[in-house]
Amino acid sequence: MIKQLASASTLALALVAQPAFAQDARTTFDGFYVGGAVGLENVENGTKGLEFDTNRDGTFGDVVRTTTNADAFSPGFCGGQALGNSAVAGCASDNDKFGYAVRVGFDKRFGDVVGGLLLEGANSKAVDYATGFSTTPASYTYARSIDYSIAARARLGLSPGDGRGLLYATGGVAYADIDRAFTTTNTANSFTLDDGGDEMEWGWQAGGGAEILLGSNLTVGFEYLYSKYNDDSFVTVGRGTAPATNPFLLNGGATDLRPADRKIDQHAFRVTAGFQF
């Protein structure tokens, strides 16, 4: 998919490079266009940490207990990446990364109002972390990132005056490849991601932006885009080399764990460029 996005981006740049005389001059947002965007991507940093299903009945929210009925995760949780095997070491924040997107769309002008549809492919490497600390001591970190996404959005905006400026809102559906990874300093138990660490998920997007139509049918602008995806994945903690008295094994022989925040919330702040046909 990454190669496809790169190819589409190259095609878009090639179209932009066409001589101005080969295209009809455009003075308003009305017709087909291709474009791209690049900017900073941020995954919302929650503080909920992890949650557990100790009897694997599908209901999360259980407390992992030791043989003395103490809370095995009493040291606490954080919404970041563990910096050591204990809560004292603390956590790093989620990783913000630069992402890019390519798109093709169509706008129709009705007086000062512009409405349209677009298809977009995007790539992002921003990472969301959720961590828990046990009394062992040991750390358990669940990482999630959006590898790539495909979206179909509508946009509606105002383009008053000479029609060379556009303020718009946008929203629609998205389908994303969510990458997951799990790391821990616990070397006794076994840990298995339920989906192998990679799964497609549906979500939605909403945002807004502004564009200016320059000469030679070129547009530039900026855009904010919010994306939200569901995530039902989890990690199964098995016995490994741990004794039967291990807290993860006491209530059914295994425990499932996952981020307490099941939603993935992403914010993108982009600079855009396009070419109007």
Where are the regions that the model predicts?
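Gram-negative outer-membrane beta-barrel domains
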Residues: 2-10, 14-277
